[in-house]
């Protein structure tokens, strides 16, 4: 997902923080 601040996936977490 895009807004995933509590994801276990590093890339997903970074994307969430950046977006």
UniProtKB/Swiss-Prot annotation:
GO cellular component: extracellular space
GO molecular-function term, one example from the UniProt record: cytokine activity
Keyword Isomerase in record: yes
Record keywords, A-Z: Cytokine, Isomerase
Induction per the UniProt record: Inhibited by free fatty acids and haematin.
E.C. designation(s): 5.3.3.12
Uppermost EC category: isomerase
Catalytic activity: L-dopachrome = 5,6-dihydroxyindole-2-carboxylate
Coiled coil: none
Protein function: Tautomerization of the methyl ester of L-dopachrome.
Family recorded in the similarity comment: Belongs to the MIF family.
Protein name: L-dopachrome-methyl ester tautomerase
Provenance organism: Trichuris muris (Mouse whipworm)
Organism placement in taxonomy: Eukaryota, Metazoa, Ecdysozoa, Nematoda, Enoplea
């Amino acid at each position: 997902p895009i807004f995933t601040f509590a994801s276990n996936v590093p890339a997903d977490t970074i994307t969430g923080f950046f977006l």
